Design a protein with these regions (language model features):
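Fungal N-terminal intrinsically disordered, low-complexity regulatory regions
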Residues: 476-478
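Internal alpha-helical transmembrane segments
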Residues: 135-183, 192-196, 210-213
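Internal/C-terminal transmembrane anchor helices
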Residues: 187-213, 579, 583-584, 777-780
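Hydrophobic cores of alpha-helical transmembrane segments in multi-pass integral membrane proteins
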Residues: 150-167, 229-232, 238-243, 247-249, ...
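Membrane-interfacial, low-structure loops and terminal tails that flank and connect transmembrane helices
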Residues: 175-202, 640-702
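Soluble non-transmembrane domains of integral membrane proteins
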Residues: 1-144, 210-474
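Secretory/export targeting leaders with adjacent low-complexity proregions
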Residues: 1-3, 597-600
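Active-site lining segments that contact anionic ligands and/or coordinate catalytic metals
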Residues: 54, 80-82, 102, 107, ...
Length: 795
């Protein structure tokens, strides 16, 4: 605080430096200047506590392991990095010891692990210098004291939860009901769903919006030209070999964001920007995210328009810009708009990132950039580290030799590749350029097919599987199959009709449509697994869609197991709601949930990715599903339902019930009510299914069952994350924001467990806390991932 009692926020610095010259790039040395009054000032630096190292460490070398194509200056091409360390033991320096990601080094009781490295960084501000990276490495240091005891305690608690939820209630229940007869089996009342309806729903969702075939001449050029052969063309980019369709989708997302320009496919727009750039100079193609950036840009465009007519036209155009976020490069290059962008660039919190994205879009749309990125010609050797070649490196070979010599054009061919094959590629590209300029769809389609065949022929031995490339293009062309949310919505409607109005046929149809949606979502997950060559859980799009698929898997298993119980249909309903919301988010929020396939960060190349991450996101799906049934219970109580609840231990009842439908709980009376609690059994009579109090018991039982499963999975996932963190970073817990809020979610459900034992209105409090727990979980996934910076976040 200053002399007048004011306050000043201090910026947090993760690394401590004594002077500006020692500061790491991307971690500037910026102490806060505080006015103490009387002309006195002081510099205050808020940072970590600095302690002396236990031993001297020297960085002997820094090694990079890369993906396909080697290191290109892009962080995405890095697969792993290794520091070669030497330690001073007093008697001299040791031999170099490798310290890699997920492979820490122990020395004298201390663990050293890779925390950061110096990635490439572009100059974004005036006076800043661009860096190719590789200037330093950052090592973490930990002592791991008591780690094994902590982890043993965590594992023991997981085992204890499983015993408390599953084993103990079963033992108590069987003792109480040893003398009771098994309940009668429910008559199989499901009616076979209409095959025609199911097929129609599936076809309606998966069908692309393909117009009816008409005379080719009547179609616009972007619809008439056949770009399907390019779907089997590989492009080397960011350390991967992508299909051209996937590649174009990624590149165009940098320009137009989630929007499609004039209804064109990303493949067509990429080629059209490359071959006809003049057509887009004043076209609205650059996407600007958020009202905070759009409003000042729109005001600058309107203010720069001279004359009443021009101003009115600008106002109308900017009204559309504020709605859809697309603006033309010509408008962005107006001096008044550029001045506004420079001002916005200074606002590091609200608009600097958006300005950086606009600058990136303006660069990506340039024909020179687009041509240089078309690395479609495989190298002459089988070495995966070799860079592929762009069409720009061979296209001049299509020019007549005499004319090229007269014009001074260099026709130097690529070394090691048959000149005839290179000329075939160049000739096909020239034919495509000429046909595109003439807007001749038939000739362009023929040239596209020739180009695809010619690049395949250059080196078939290193070319990826064309079937996989084709399916990858198909996957992106069909919106990543996120339209399956429509099928889940249809399932929800039918299931609600069947469950609320006790309409057996609607319930059967709803379960059938849920089965179709589940199969379609399974196909989407498996297809992405195949085309990406890794399990899809390493970015937000994959985490959200795969988590909902896990929830649907669980629901499908429970529905099969309990198909003759009154609870039939409720798990399918909650899973349908979960998957519908997840796929809707993926479909309508492609900026936040980027569907493009990229390489994983180096730290994710570990078996724990497939254990810890899958368990955590599975628990999140079950938490959301529990919130759906809890919301149903709250609605039931709001509509005047009695304060009924399922007797404790809902999941144990599933273990006891089996799949035959024989009642393990309560005989003809439905759910067992006992003074001492015990496992809740889903009874077989109509009263349990929908009579007075029965609906509340079912909803509470479903919530309790899903909550118990998610409770154990969440805690197990947190423990597994601690094991992975200790394995990778030398410490099991670092108070990272996402770690903290995952723990907060667990605490809410731990509170739920204990509150349920003490309160009288168990069903109400269970539902309220289940909804609160889901809110904390969603806060963890949304705010922590996209707003707050941390090891697990995308901020």
């Amino acid at each position: 605080s200053g002399p007048q009692g004011g306050s000043t926020w201090l910026d947090y610095h993760p690394y401590v430096f004594d002077r500006r010259a020692d500061a790491l790039r991307r971690h500037p040395f910026e102490p806060t200047l505080v006015d103490l009054g009387g002309g006195r000032k002081a510099e205050v630096l808020f940072s970590r506590v600095r302690v002396p190292m236990p031993t001297s460490v020297a960085l002997d070398d820094f090694l990079l392991a890369t993906h396909i194509g080697g290191y290109t200056g892009e962080a995405s091409t890095i697969r792993d990095y290794t520091s070669m360390l030497r330690f001073d033991d007093g008697a001299g320096w040791s031999e170099p010891v490798p310290c890699s990601v997920n492979a820490p080094v122990e020395h004298d009781g201390w663990w050293f692990f890779q925390a950061q490295w110096d990635p490439p960084d572009q100059a974004r501000f005036e006076g800043d210098r661009a860096s190719r990276g590789l200037n330093y490495t950052v090592l973490g240091v930990a002592n791991r004291e008591g780690v094994m005891i902590q982890l043993f305690g965590c594992i023991l608690s997981v085992v204890g939860m499983a015993y408390a939820f599953y084993v103990k209630p079963i033992i108590k229940r069987r003792k109480r009901e040893a003398a009771q007869a098994l309940a009668a089996q429910v008559r199989a009342g499901g009616q076979r769903a209409s095959t025609a309806l199911m097929v129609a729903v599936a076809c309606a969702v998966l069908a692309c919006a393909v117009p009816a075939r008409a005379d080719e001449a009547a179609k616009p050029f972007h619809e008439a030209v056949d770009l399907l052969p390019l779907g089997e063309v590989a492009v080397q980019t960011e350390g991967r070999l992508k299909s051209f369709g996937s590649f174009a989708n990624t590149q165009m997302s940098f320009v137009s964001g989630p929007r499609r320009i004039n209804g064109q496919s990303p493949e067509f727009t990429y080629l059209d920007l490359l071959l006809r750039p003049e057509a887009y100079e004043d076209a609205d193609i650059v996407f600007v995210k958020g009202a905070a950036a759009r409003v000042p840009i729109a005001e600058a465009v309107i203010d720069s328009s001279k004359g009443d007519d021009a101003r009115k036209a600008a106002e109308e155009r900017m009204a559309g810009f504020l709605k859809h976020g697309l603006i033309s490069p010509a408008l962005l290059q107006r001096p008044e708009v550029m001045a506004t962008l420079r001002q916005m660039e200074q606002d590091l919190i609200r608009t600097e990132k958006v300005v950086s994205q606009i600058q990136g879009a303006m660069s990506v749309r340039e024909p020179k950039y687009l041509l240089s990125r078309l690395l479609v010609i495989p190298p002459a050797t089988d070495d995966p580290q070799q860079r592929w070649h762009s069409l720009g490196e061979v296209m001049m070979l299509a020019v007549d030799a005499e004319r090229a010599k007269a014009a001074g054009i260099d026709q130097k061919p690529l070394p090691g590749i048959d000149i005839a094959l290179q000329r075939a590629v160049a000739s096909a590209w020239k034919d495509l350029v000429d046909a595109w300029a003439a807007q001749d769809a038939a000739a362009a389609s023929k040239a596209v097919a020739a180009l695809a065949a010619s690049v395949h022929a250059v080196n078939p031995a290193v070319y990826p599987d064309t079937a996989r490339l084709g399916w990858e293009s198909w996957y992106f062309r069909n919106g990543n199959l996120t339209r399956v949310w429509l099928v889940y919505m249809a399932a929800i409607i039918l299931l609600l009709l069947g469950l609320v109005y006790r309409w057996p046929r609607a319930l059967a149809w709803g379960l059938a449509v849920f089965g179709i949606a589940f199969l379609l979502q399974t196909a989407a997950v498996m297809l992405r697994w195949w085309i990406s060559q890794r399990w899809p859980n390493s970015n937000m799009f994959e985490a959200v869609t795969t988590a909902s698929w896990f929830g649907a898997c669980c629901a499908a298993g429970l529905e099969l197991w309990l198909r003759r119980r009154p609870v039939r249909g409720w798990f399918a309903l909650t899973a349908s709601a979960c998957s519908m919301v997840a796929l809707m988010a993926a479909h309508f929020l492609p900026v936040q949930l980027n569907p493009n396939i990229s390489n994983m960060m180096p730290v994710l190349h570990d078996v724990w990715l497939y254990i810890h991450t899958n368990v955590i996101i599975f628990s999140y799906a079950l938490i959301f599903m529990a919130a759906i049934s809890a919301g149903g219970y709250l609605l039931y109580r709001w509509r005047g339902g009695p304060a009924t609840y399922a007797r404790a231990g809902g999941t144990a009842a599933i273990v006891m019930a089996g799949g035959t439908g024989s009642a393990a709980a309560g005989g003809a009376g439905g759910a067992v009510v006992s003074a001492g609690g015990g496992a809740m059994g889903f009874g077989d009579d109509a009263q349990s299914a929908g009579g007075k109090g029965g609906l509340g018991e079912l909803l509470d039982g479903v919530t309790l069952l899903l909550m118990e499963l998610s409770f154990i999975l969440l805690w197990a996932g947190i423990v597994m994350g601690a094991i992975w963190a200790d394995h990778s970073w030398g410490r099991p817990w670092g108070w990272d924001p996402k770690e903290v809020f995952a723990l907060n979610t667990f605490i809410v459900f731990a509170l739920l467990i204990h509150v349920r034992w003490r309160v009288k209105d168990k069903g109400l409090w269970t539902a309220v806390l289940a909804v609160i727990g889901a809110a904390v979980m969603l806060f963890n996934w949304i705010v922590i991932n996209f707003v707050i910076t941390g090891l697990h976040s995308y901020a």
